[in-house]
């Protein structure tokens, strides 16, 4: 059963003193999963109180460094703790080579117990305890996938690094929680389109069309101050949540 989510990192491109780059934790009754693992994720994950024994899945949306830069260090720390249970890594076809080469180029053995799933070949997956994943491709400069995670009663959708697209609306349809990128404010929508990103207003329009229950925005340009993004409201609720676990 899906229980909680937490934004571990919400900065786009580069971390700031206050915001880490992209990572989200989702907790179920039986296990935890991580979506994206930007630079510095391990420290924020540890401070948030998560434990190795519960982490069973890491999902990667795409291979840009602000979404993968913390992954090899994270897996290295896992190796140092001698964690024995299988960790399933789900993501683009390049993910396995990225990790294998990262360990090899560092002179480290990659002898942990991993399983690999290429998301381009497996758009729908059954995980554990009735939790399922469905994915759809988004519109970014490189291949990027959105994730819908659901059980028999709840659903959470994570969409990042994309133009506003009908696939986002379809994937998020009637979800309990939509976590969507909002790299730019709407007055910079031409720049957002140039860089294949979404504005805050476009994300809200996607939430409206998809009839989601709760919208949470993430992946903010470092140029946007906390004061600006904390003013964003959708359906009477704040769209920005920092460093707190939330019920799905």
Segments from the language model and where they lie:
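Conserved beta-strand hairpin/beta-sheet module of binuclear metal-dependent hydrolase folds
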Residues: 1-48, 144-160, 177
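Active-site neighborhood of phospho(di)ester-bond hydrolases with catalytic His/Asp-centered motifs
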Residues: 34-38, 56-66, 92, 156-162, ...
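Active-site metal-binding motif and surrounding structural segment of the metallo-beta-lactamase
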Residues: 40-90, 118
């Amino acid at each position: 059963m899906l229980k909680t989510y937490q934004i571990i990192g919400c900065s786009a491109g580069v971390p700031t003193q206050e915001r880490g780059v992209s990572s989200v934790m989702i907790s179920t009754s039986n296990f935890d999963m991580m979506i994206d693992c930007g630079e510095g994720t391990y420290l924020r994950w540890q401070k948030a109180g998560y434990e190795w024994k519960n982490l069973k899945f890491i999902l990667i949306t795409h291979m840009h460094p602000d979404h993968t830069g913390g992954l090899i260090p994270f897996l290295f720390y896992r190796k140092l703790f001698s964690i024995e249970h299988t960790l399933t890594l789900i993501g683009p076809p390049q993910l396995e080579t990225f990790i294998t080469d990262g360990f090899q180029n560092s002179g480290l053995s990659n002898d942990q117990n991993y399983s690999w799933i290429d998301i381009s070949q497996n758009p729908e997956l059954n995980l554990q305890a009735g939790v399922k994943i469905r994915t759809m491709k988004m519109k970014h400069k490189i291949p990027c996938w959105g994730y819908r995670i659901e059980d028999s009663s709840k659903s959470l959708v994570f969409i990042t690094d994309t133009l506003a697209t009908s696939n986002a609306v379809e994937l998020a349809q009637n979800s309990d929680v939509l976590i969507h990128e909002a790299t730019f404010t709407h007055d910079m929508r031409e720049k957002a389109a140039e860089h294949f990103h979404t504005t805050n207003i476009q994300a809200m329009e996607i939430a409206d069309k998809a009839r989601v229950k709760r919208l949470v925005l993430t992946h903010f340009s470092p140029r946007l101050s906390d004061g600006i993004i904390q003013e964003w409201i959708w359906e009477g609720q704040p769209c920005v949540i920092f460093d707190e676990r939330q019920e799905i």
